[in-house]
Amino acid sequence: PDNPFATDATKFALLSLAAGEWLVRHADDQAVLHLHDWHAGLLALLRERLPSFERLKHLRCVLTLHNLALQGLRPRRGHPSSFERWFPELDPDDPLLSDPRYADVANPLAAAIRSVDHINTVSPTNAREILQPTDHARGFHGGEGLEVLLQNAAADGRLHGILNGCDYTAIPQHRPTFSDLTDTVAATLTEWSDQQPHNRSLFTLASRSLNQARHKQPSIILTAVSRLTDQKAGLLLARTQGITLLQQLLRSLPSDAVLLLLGSGDPGIETALAQHAATDPRLVFLRGFSEPLANAVFAAGDLFLMPSTFEPCGISQMYAMRAGQPCLVHAVGGLNDTVKDNINGFSFSGPNPEAQVANCMASMIHAQQVFFDQPERWQEIVDEARAARFLWSDAAAQYEAKMYV
């Protein structure tokens, strides 16, 4: 518990070994070995280096990258959670393990990128982004130190971008009324308050703000459903001229607007959002997650906010669009591949964080102008969002054609 990265790495090293040993016994029944992220990356190396895993070499081995920022870095030797301790029969200085930045580190993800037959990330835009180096000064998330390896893979025809799909078997048929939504929120807050008495004051604040809004239909309902991490909320809390982007967004709204934000995660981000909610009742911060509540929020909102700093694919924007709620997004990764500015939603970009904040605000003001002043145009955008389809059958066909054959 005091060393979670080491503990997790050891667990996944054991998982790779155990999965490989099982596959050796059942290799004739398999055609493709599909690995995901660093957690399974060592299996690609074991397939190459362990004599007992020789039978696995006839299997096509492919890798999907969901989050390149997490790479499972561990010492090569000299630590209980090191490559030498996990696999004493193998060379801890194996070049397949080399990290492009740190000489004494074993990088499971780098080993997999070097070893597998094909690699994909979960959107075409992200597959292009990761070929460039990450530049935090520009607010750009790219190859996270592995861009040269990925450039080599792309040059070899081994790197692909395949957009994730969305389930369309349960499309909301009707938009809930605001009264229906507030009833769902109120019931959820009561349940959470009973389960988490230490957070009761936060839930009471959300209930109070909600009660102020429920007496009449808000002029516009903004929504967000998210894990609260720097990736998801960092731009909202970025400060320019002494105030956050979230404060700017709230100030741009009519007095009878509502922003429902559902999510939990980083305690510092939770605290910051609670402080914003305490000073502006238009923000209803729902700390936690409930799938029925999330579905109600997706179905009942007018505009869904997703200004992620990076987003390999994203799924929340697909859920919102499926329900007929246009999205305002940062045009990165899968958000760029799913939300088309002024067609089925709104998007922004910028060469640095300051420009991204300014352009997000400009996009927000534009979206409100369309919503309030051009109702027919807004309905066209709603219809385009609802009609968009990102099918798993299409993704599966691409996996078969590009990765498995």
Q: What are the language-model segments listed below?
A:
Residues 1-405:
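Catalytic cores of nucleotide-sugar-dependent glycosyltransferases that transfer UDP/GDP/TDP-activated
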